[in-house]
Regions:
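Beta-strand-rich domains and repeat architectures in extracellular enzymes and scaffolds
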Residues: 1-52, 81-83
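Surface-exposed loop and turn segments in beta-propeller and other repeat-based domains
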Residues: 5-22, 67-76, 119-137, 186-203, ...
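Repeated scaffold domains used in trafficking and secretory/extracellular systems
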Residues: 26-37, 72-87, 129-146, 202-212, ...
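Loop/turn-rich, solvent-exposed surfaces of beta-rich toroidal or solenoidal domains
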Residues: 32, 275-280, 285, 317-415
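Short glycine/acidic-enriched loop and turn motifs that connect beta-strands
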Residues: 51-53, 99-103, 159-164, 224-226, ...
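Asp-box/WD-like beta-propeller blade repeats and closely related beta-sheet repeat scaffolds
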Residues: 64-87, 96-150, 156-162, 167-169, ...
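Beta-propeller blade signature
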Residues: 108, 167-182, 224-227, 287-295, ...
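Long, internal scaffold/assembly segments composed of regular secondary structure
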Residues: 210-324
């Protein structure tokens, strides 16, 4: 798991010289898997029918080797939320659920063999524990989770679009490492002494994944960016507000029918040892660099601001961030506007439900990337004697993509 959310790797990826393309046909899921994670044995971990599975993606027809189904194995009533699922250092699958629990699943034995039925080794009702700690009802659902460098499990409530005027109550918080270890060892844990929360202002909530470094957990809500630390409670090291014009939707004359996802910045924060990088949701959208120690905005500049007429900008995936350790941080941002469902604006919509029908624009689902706005740009943030400065290195208005781009530093290619 890339806790920095850099979306970059030092691994050698395909060079595109005499490439061989392998195809595996999906005949079980209604859609091809929207996310693929790999464990240390090279197994592909993917969403499957509301659950999670290890599947053979090299077979001519995709085959399931082992899986966990909430319906078959746990009484049903919920689905795995795959967007912010990850694997921990022991190859356990850590996943938030649609009923506000976090699960940890053991998918392989000690030798790396896939278990036909994954073993649930941890199940915590985060919303109930957070409500008990806060002393009031939460009106937002669990969105994302991540471990910090001390093994505490941080969580954030929210959804893919949180409207401030709806005044929902949300929290940021963590489950202490000691409680998680106790549960994994088969012991009882007193969650009243192990779950700590920070109550957000009404209408504030997370819309993204969480990043973690040795400095703490970095969480971006629809209005602020936070650095938080676990100190027998949630220590807010800093809180930095940023700009947003609100949820963006297609208008008269636009070449798209969908919109963006987030009300605020849709770019999960990405980290370097010194900086926090993300985009706001202003008009034009700006890339921001915050000082990791203080939260001060040390550099910013508009991105994707030279698109053809009829296109808007919404950055909804984490950016690629590469720190060369010599004073230059390269960031690559990609436009996503057009893929978001217009139905997210409905007053009774729940943007925490991660399903194709709930999140995505029908025309994008059926017609593909011609229904999203183009735009990919590289911006370098350079350390100078007086601070930092940003400069655009290149911009491509002929590319449209909704997948999370990846960088191989070994090849210098973006995938």
């Amino acid at each position: 798991h890339d806790g920095y959310n850099t979306d970059s790797t030092d691994e050698v990826l395909p060079l595109g010289i005499y490439p061989e393309i392998n195809v595996s046909y999906e005949k079980t899921n209604a859609n091809a898997s929207p996310a693929i994670y790999f464990d240390s044995y090279g197994h592909a971990v993917v969403p499957l029918l509301g659950g999670i599975a290890i599947r053979d993606l090299n077979a001519e027809e995709t085959k399931t080797l082992g899986y966990f189904s909430p319906k078959q194995h746990d009484g049903g009533g919920y689905v795995i939320q795959s967007s912010y699922t990850f694997l921990d250092s022991e190859n356990r699958i850590v996943c938030p659920t649609s009923n506000n629990h976090v699960l940890m699943l053991r998918a392989t034995d000690e030798a790396g063999n896939v278990l036909p039925e994954f073993e649930k080794v941890l199940d915590i009702d985060i919303k109930a524990a957070a409500e008990a700690a806060l002393g009031k009802e939460l009106t937002q659902n669990l969105l994302s989770v991540v471990f910090d460098y001390d093994g505490n499990l941080w969580f954030a409530t929210g959804g893919f679009r949180i409207y401030p005027e709806r005044e929902q109550q949300g929290v940021l918080g963590y489950i202490a490492h000691s409680a998680i270890e106790a549960i994994l060892n088969g012991e009882q844990a007193d969650l009243s002494k192990a779950v700590f929360v920070y109550g957000l202002a009404l209408g504030e909530g997370a819309e993204n994944g969480i990043a973690a470094s040795k400095d703490g957990a970095v969480i971006l809500t629809n209005q602020n960016c936070y650095l938080l630390r676990a100190e027998e409670g949630v220590d807010v090291v800093w809180c930095t507000p940023y700009e947003s014009v609100g949820a963006k939707v297609s208008g008269e004359g636009d070449k798209t029918t969908g919109g963006g996802l987030a009300w605020g910045g849709g770019c999960s924060p990405s980290l370097t040892p010194d900086l926090v990088m993300f985009t706001d949701n202003a008009d034009p959208v700006k890339l921001l660099a915050l000082d990791m120690k203080t939260g001060e905005i040390v550099a910013s500049m508009p991105v994707l601001d030279d698109l053809p007429e009829g296109y808007q900008v919404a950055v909804e995936n984490s950016a690629i961030v590469y720190d060369d350790s010599e004073g230059t941080v390269s960031t690559i941002v990609c436009n996503w506007f057009g893929a978001g469902s217009a139905g997210l604006a409905d007053p009774d919509s729940d943007s925490s439900i991660q399903s194709y029908a709930n999140i995505y624009d029908t025309n994008w689902l059926t017609k593909g990337n011609c229904m999203i706005a183009p735009g990919v740009e590289r911006v370098d943030t350079v350390k100078t004697d007086s601070g930092y400065e940003m400069k655009s290195i290149w911009s491509r208005n002929d590319l449209s993509d909704t997948s999370i781009l990846k960088l191989s530093t070994a090849t210098g290619y973006i995938y």
